[in-house]
């Protein structure tokens, strides 16, 4: 059955949003919501948050506080441009956006939508979780509450957001210059991740890694930190033995399941390959694909 067209409201002043959201639903890029609508999800009145993007920059850096503020309502393209134009450095998020869907989707999709959809496979979430993000949420009375991203993610498609609340921005402690993101999907573009990994660390002058933070998607009910593997790496030189130990430690951090995209077995092998690849560049010999055989037979075994 074709859904009836919703009423679309497009505020440009953030102060108007809470009032308009009473009994309505937020929409940003619409790249998840419109798919849900086709599947029959109801949304009688939509409040389009993208009109708010003109009121502020996509990314701001507060050097004194050592913090980056990233808009939840700008398209991902604007966020990536903000990060590469010198507004701040966040290599893992920049890499995640570059591997996200396709240019057309990146020109529409937002971080707010990616967070609120609550998918364990969401591609911006590992970088934000690894960086220790805090989510700024506007409450129905126009107040502000802040919640750690780790507590915001409650389960598959479930987040800590009440009716009438909306996400205005995400704040992270300024990430180190060394970080990255890699995903494995069924193809290079327009692919939901079978698995994804974000990492960040400082590399000390003697080569040891400190402040190691890793987060992985599609291996648990929510995106998760790889705390055990990170602890193995902390303050160590990433020698072959240390990398082997960190890769072996991943099993304690993840609980993948078989689903229509990939088997748990395949995901465990990909998880090992992705971490090895993150730790052993740029010799070029340690690509994740070399550690997995992405055949349909294996994915389903
Ligand atoms: C072809 C295609 C390819 C895709 N590829 C990827 C991919 O590679 N990686 C990936 O992670 N995802 C992918 N997706 C999923 C989707 O693009 C992302 O989840 C995207 O970030 C959603 O953002 P949006 O702004 O479009 O959200 P919308 O669709 O506008 O909204 C999604 C949900 O979030 C709510 N919402 C939106 N913004 C806010 C806010 N600021 N505050 C409160 N609630 C809000 C809406 O009410 C709705 O429930 C893909 C989707 C499509 C259609």
Pin down the residues of each PLM region.
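C-terminal structural segment of proteins
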Residues: 1-301
């Amino acid at each position: 059955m074709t859904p009836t067209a919703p009423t679309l409201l497009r505020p440009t002043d953030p102060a108007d949003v809470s009032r308009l959201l009473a009994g309505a639903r937020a929409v940003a890029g619409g790249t998840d919501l419109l798919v849900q609508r086709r599947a029959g999800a109801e949304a009688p009145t939509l409040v389009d948050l993208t009109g708010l993007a003109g009121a502020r920059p996509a990314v701001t850096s507060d050097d004194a506080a050592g913090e980056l503020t990233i808009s939840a309502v700008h398209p991902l393209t604007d966020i990536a441009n903000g990060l590469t134009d010198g507004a701040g450095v966040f290599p893992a998020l920049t890499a995640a956006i570059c591997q996200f869907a396709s240019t057309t989707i990146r020109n529409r999709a937002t971080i707010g939508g990616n967070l609120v959809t609550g998918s364990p496979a969401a591609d911006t979430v590992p970088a934000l979780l690894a960086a220790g993000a805090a989510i700024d949420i506007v409450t129905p009375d126009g107040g502000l509450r802040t919640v750690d991203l780790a507590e915001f993610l409650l389960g598959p498609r479930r987040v800590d957001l009440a009716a009438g609340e909306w996400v205005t921005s995400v704040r992270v402690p300024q990430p180190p210059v060394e970080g990255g993101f890699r995903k494995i999907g069924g193809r290079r573009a327009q692919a939901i991740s079978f698995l994804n990994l974000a990492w960040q660390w400082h590399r000390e002058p003697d080569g040891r890694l400190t402040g190691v933070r890793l987060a992985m998607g599609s291996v648990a009910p929510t995106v998760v930190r790889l705390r055990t593997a990170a602890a193995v790496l902390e303050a160590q030189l990433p020698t072959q033995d240390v990398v082997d130990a960190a890769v072996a430690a991943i099993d304690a951090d993840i609980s993948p399941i078989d689903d229509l995209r990939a088997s748990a077995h395949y995901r465990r092998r990909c998880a090992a390959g992705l971490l090895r690849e993150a730790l052993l560049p740029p010799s070029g010999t340690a690509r994740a694909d070399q550690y997995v055989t992405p055949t349909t037979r294996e994915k389903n075994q």
